[in-house]
Amino acid sequence: AAYRKYEKTGFVLGESRIDLMPEALRRYRDELRGTSPAGPVSGKTFRLISGRSPWQTHTITQDLYPAGDARRRVTMLINDRDAEELGLQSGDKAVVSGTKGSIRVILETSADLRRGVLRGQYGWGTSACLLRFSLEGSYNLNELTDADALEPATGDACFGDLRVTIRREK
């Protein structure tokens, strides 16, 4: 087979062409270039991300460990410098609010978390009918999710771009 250098973008397949950068994705990319990634806290909003904690596999696992076990801890992580600027510290109770609702959380500070970001634990919440007991600080991140906010490139929910505010619980 002979080497042939492609001079145009995309793959050439006979008369058709695969467009690796559709116009809709190109527009979305250009819109994103005008925004800055979550960086230092603005004092108003944080980007909320979620994930599982090391010992957690799903909501039901909160019933597997005895009271006082660290694996049963339900917290929301905040960067330690962001927390200090807001007068918050590990163990404080706080309210995290988005456009669709609010949740009550217990904070845990972390130097490893990027500034301007809150990290919630996936899969917790006190409304599951199979749970024998709920843990203090349990929350459901879905209460903050806007089902109408869709990511323009894929049409999926904007779980990775949820903006929230945080304040100490009164």
Task: Name what the model sees in each region.
Residues 1-66:
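Long, low-complexity segments enriched in small/aliphatic residues
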Residues 1, 59, 64-77, 81-170:
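Long, contiguous, secondary-structure-rich segments that constitute the structural scaffold
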